[in-house]
């Protein structure tokens, strides 16, 4: 709804003063893409995979083990002794609890790392956007999500990514 409202307001403004907007230099920017396609964000993704990969593999193994126990209970539960069945059920419940706990822990750690990365990269992205706007002499820059279609020559996302990659 917000994007539609932005679109309507921009369209109304453009139609209300065609001569003023005819001389304006307008560009479109996909802010999220500019952030995620930067070299720093790509490097973060590689580093995060190395950092969180072992935990993710541990979770997958835990899930596999729990699934195997569940399958064993379903297929052989009626043939098992009462003690064996109770032990298998208890093991399954413990693995399920461990999975939930470790999954939550991993998600929280990853979210914290993502926030830290965003905190570090946002100033660089903002600087790259400002420098690209100044260099291009743009009067108005619109978020890509607020427009239905745009010609490639009006999209400055690539320029912002390149500028951000130059910043150290």
UniProtKB/Swiss-Prot annotation:
Q: Does the keyword Transmembrane belong to this entry?
A: no
The cross-references to SMART domains, in alphabetical order and at most eight, read: OmpH
**GO-annotated molecular function:** unfolded protein binding
Looking up InterPro entries in the UniProt record yields: Chaperone_Skp (IPR005632), Skp_dom_sf (IPR024930)
User: Is Lipid metabolism a UniProt keyword of this protein?
Assistant: no
Check the UniProt entry and state the signal peptide residues, or none.
Answer: 1-22
- Give the family per the record: Belongs to the Skp family.
Protein name, as recorded: Skp-like protein
């Amino acid at each position: 709804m917000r994007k539609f409202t932005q679109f309507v307001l921009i369209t109304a403004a453009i139609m209300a003063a065609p001569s003023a907007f005819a001389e304006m230099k307008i560009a479109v920017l996909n802010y999220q893409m500019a952030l995620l396609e930067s070299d720093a964000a790509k490097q973060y993704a590689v580093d995060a995979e190395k950092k969180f990969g072992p935990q993710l593999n541990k979770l997958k193994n835990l899930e596999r083990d729990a699934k195997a126990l569940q399958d064993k209970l379903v297929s052989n539960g009626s043939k098992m002794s009462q003690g064996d069945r109770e032990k298998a059920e208890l093991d399954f419940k413990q693995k399920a609890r461990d999975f939930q706990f470790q999954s939550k822990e991993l998600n929280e750690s990853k979210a914290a790392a993502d926030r830290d990365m965003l905190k570090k990269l946002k100033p660089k992205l903002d600087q790259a956007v400002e420098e690209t706007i100044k260099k291009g002499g743009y009067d108005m820059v619109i978020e890509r999500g607020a427009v239905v279609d745009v010609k490639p020559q009006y999209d400055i996302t690539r320029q912002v990514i390149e500028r951000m990659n130059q910043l150290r």
